[in-house]
Regions:
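Ubiquitin-like/PB1-type beta-grasp interaction modules and other compact soluble beta-rich domains
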Residues: 1-77
Length: 78
């Protein structure tokens, strides 16, 4: 599974992409956030959005067949 990070998250994580194999008990988007957030606390921010294979999700969503998980910082505008 590929994890990608955009904007300030890329800076806070220190890279734009990580290849990983989550443990078996990490089976949805929220458990993945908690698992990787243990290493990169910026990802625990509830305003960070998650996209699974280019589809924004909210709440726990299964990740069994997902190839890419993107972590997106909040967008500001004016």
């Amino acid at each position: 599974m590929k994890l990608t990070f955009f904007g300030r998250l890329r800076d806070q994580v220190g890279t734009g992409e990580i290849d990983c194999s989550p443990p078996a008990n990490v089976d949805d988007s929220e458990s993945l956030r908690l698992w990787i957030g243990g290493q990169h606390s910026a990802l625990l921010d509830p305003t960070v959005r998650i996209a699974l294979d280019d589809i924004l999700v909210s709440g726990p969503t299964p990740i069994a067949d997902v190839v890419e998980v993107a972590f997106l910082p909040p967008v500001s505008g004016g």
